[in-house]
Amino acid sequence: MVRIQEVRKCGEEICMMRNILCIILCMILLSACSSKSNEIIEGYSNCEEYYSDGFQDYIDYCKYFYKESEDKIFEENSYYSIVTKENIDDIKSYFDKFPYESMEDSNKYDFETDNINEGDYYSLRAGSNNDNYSVFLYDVNSHILYYIHYNI
């Protein structure tokens, strides 16, 4: 009789531990899904986000509005580099080939490559075939972080 109670108690402890681990795993998964990219720096006052969801093919366009006092954050952030005359054409090429017409809200796409200037800040993540890329461009004149993502 004592032995049966010990087995039952052990089974209940295992079940409780399994439930706790399941809850922890769910919390981790949910927090990972809702977290933004490291390149989207906290402190923006407003944002406009346009996503075209697909199973594997999707296009994103977002704008994050900052105050002028936030400019220094981009300068000090390790994810960002400064736009120079040597890399400006490469950065512009990603925006030029960005297929915004495929977006559900294509009329919301208002980015002009003339907005890219030396002294702005950018971060670029690109796949090997140019079929997957993310570009983050912080325009120091307008204090807007532009984000485009293309995955086909």
Give residue spans per PLM region:
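Intrinsically disordered, low-complexity segments enriched in small/polar residues
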Residues: M1, K9-C10, I41, S52, ...
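Sec-dependent bacterial lipoprotein signal peptides
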Residues: M1-S31
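Intrinsically disordered, low-complexity regions of eukaryotic proteins
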Residues: R8, I14-C15, I59-C62, N141
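Intrinsic disorder/low-structure terminal segments
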Residues: E13, I24, Y64, I73, ...
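Short alpha-helical segments and helix-capping/turn motifs at coil-helix boundaries
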Residues: C15, C47-E48, D131-N132
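Generic hydrophobic/packing signal
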Residues: M27, A32-S34, E39, E118-D120
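N-terminal export/targeting and maturation segments
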Residues: C33-K92
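Extracytoplasmic electrostatic interaction patches
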Residues: I88-I152
